[in-house]
């Protein structure tokens, strides 16, 4: 093999390894959790007002986890194990324009009717902790979302965190739209 051919083969192999590493990281199949140069950034905060009382909103959020997961959510959620008010669940989120699916494994803890907490076990970053706080306001509920996302490897990890956080927050906002619609449907006067 000539020197040029060897260099080309080395570049091709490096590109292949980098592509595989990117795929495994993005999809959550491999989590790099070294703690080296760990940086933590906030997720949120943001809020949404739902025209339904906190117990109804809580039940809408908790039902797919604590009860039977609806068939319509099968492509988004799989509960691995249930134990009282805590579950271990996989969440699936389309990324890269739907070409890939990011999978996260998270514990989800329920404190009826005011708090749902999420903690990442495995995913595209080594650390995520987040919560939904439900506060009654008249006949409505304010859902407040807060959290934090941590990555390793200093500036490189910070760059990755910016990309992951944008997709993460977009997924939460999208889920809030569904929560709002279903909770308000359940609380509509025609349902009483």
Show the residue positions of the predicted features:
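A conserved amphipathic terminal alpha-helix motif
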Residues: 3, 20-27, 148-192
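Glycine-rich portal/gate segments that line the openings of hydrophobic small-molecule binding cavities
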Residues: 4, 49, 65-71, 75-124, ...
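Hydrophobic ligand-binding cavity/cleft-lining segments
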Residues: 6, 10-85
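Generic, low-specificity signal for short hydrophobic/alpha-helical stretches with a mild N-terminal bias
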Residues: 30-32, 39-40, 89, 100, ...
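Short amphipathic alpha-helical segments, especially helix-boundary/capping motifs
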Residues: 31-34, 80-82, 105-109, 151-155
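Short loop segments at secondary-structure junctions
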Residues: 52-54, 111, 137-139
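Non-cytosolic head/periplasmic domains of membrane-anchored proteins
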Residues: 115-162, 167-171
């Amino acid at each position: 093999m000539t020197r040029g051919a060897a260099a080309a083969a080395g570049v091709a192999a490096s590109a292949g390894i980098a592509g595989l590493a990117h795929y495994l990281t993005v999809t959550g199949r491999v989590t790099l959790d070294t703690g080296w140069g760990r940086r933590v950034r906030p997720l949120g905060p943001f809020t949404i007002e739902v025209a339904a009382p906190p117990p109804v909103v809580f039940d809408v959020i908790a039902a797919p986890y604590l009860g039977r997961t609806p068939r319509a959510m099968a492509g988004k959620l799989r509960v691995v194990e249930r134990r009282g008010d805590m579950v271990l669940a996989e969440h699936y989120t389309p990324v890269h324009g739907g070409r890939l699916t990011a999978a996260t494994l998270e514990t989800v803890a329920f404190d009826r009717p005011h708090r749902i907490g999420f903690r990442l076990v495995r995913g595209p970053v080594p650390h995520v902790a987040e919560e939904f706080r439900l506060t009654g306001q008249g006949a409505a509920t304010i859902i407040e979302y807060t959290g934090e996302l941590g990555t390793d490897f200093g500036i490189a990890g910070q760059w990755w965190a910016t990309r992951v956080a944008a997709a993460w927050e977009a997924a939460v906002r999208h889920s809030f739209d569904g929560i709002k619609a279903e909770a308000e449907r359940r609380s509509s006067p025609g349902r009483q």
